[in-house]
């Protein structure tokens, strides 16, 4: 997958379905009192025909209200940091960082349901999957018409340890499947976790001020 596409990739009603209620209860339990998360991820991207485009893995960290860190370790390194005001995308092998203002794309990420569950019904139509899949309870999220989202549909899969998987399908049918592990709740983040400072010799593209 092209590097620029990586980034395009971070309920109030009562429902009758037992499976859906279980998934919502899992979400509510997982997010109750949540201020930050730190864990590992593995990611697979496939095209509309199911062909694998990329496998990758690394570390993810999230913190309220609008901070995140995606640190790809394999197959090559890339760092994406959102500090609440700006988003930095650093490619070490290119010695280049791209920076831009943090906007609606981050706020409309399906992961926003973890650190700000109140947005769930405001931004998505939430539906149930017919039955558990991969041993998980799933919530399907479809962006509402007036939501500026970069995907067509997302699914969150919950197990006994909370969020275990996330699947995202974009406008051209490309599917991104992410598995999470080793979640640490409300960790004591290092001061620079959600901060990026360009190193010596790094080209800065965009407005870093």
From Swiss-Prot:
GO cellular component: outer membrane-bounded periplasmic space
Predominant cellular place of this UniProt entry's protein: periplasm
Task of the protein: Participates in the translocation of lipoproteins from the inner membrane to the outer membrane. Only forms a complex with a lipoprotein if the residue after the N-terminal Cys is not an aspartate (The Asp acts as a targeting signal to indicate that the lipoprotein should stay in the inner membrane).
Signal peptide (residue range): 1-21
NCBIfam families xrefs: lolA (TIGR00547)
Gene that encodes the chain: lolA
Originating species: Xanthomonas campestris pv. campestris (strain B100)
Protein's name in the database: Outer-membrane lipoprotein carrier protein
Matching InterPro entries: LolA/LolB/LppX, OM_lipoprot_carrier_LolA-like, OM_lipoprot_carrier_LolA_Pbac
Family affiliation: Belongs to the LolA family.
Keyword Cell inner membrane: no
């Amino acid at each position: 997958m092209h590097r620029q596409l990586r980034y395009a990739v971070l309920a109030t009603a009562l429902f009758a379905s037992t499976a859906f209620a279980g998934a919502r209860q899992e979400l509510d339990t997982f997010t109750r009192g949540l201020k930050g998360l730190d864990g590992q991820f593995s990611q697979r991207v496939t095209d509309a025909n199911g062909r694998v485009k990329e496998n990758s893995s690394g570390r993810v960290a999230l913190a309220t209200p609008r901070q995140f860190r995606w640190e790809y370790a394999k197959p090559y390194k890339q760092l994406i940091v959102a500090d609440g005001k700006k988003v930095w995308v650093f490619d070490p092998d290119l010695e280049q960082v791209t920076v831009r203002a943090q906007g609606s794309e981050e706020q409309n990420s399906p992961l926003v349901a973890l650190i700000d569950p109140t947005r769930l019904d405001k931004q998505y139509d939430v539906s149930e999957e017919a039955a558990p899949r991969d041993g998980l309870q799933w919530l399907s999220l479809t962006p509402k018409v007036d939501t500026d989202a970069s995907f067509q549909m997302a699914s969150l899969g919950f197990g006994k340890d909370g969020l275990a998987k996330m699947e995202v399908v974009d406008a051209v049918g490309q599917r991104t499947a992410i598995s999470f592990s080793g979640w640490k709740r409300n960790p004591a983040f290092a001061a620079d976790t959600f901060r990026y400072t360009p190193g010596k010799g790094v080209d800065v593209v965009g407005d870093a001020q």
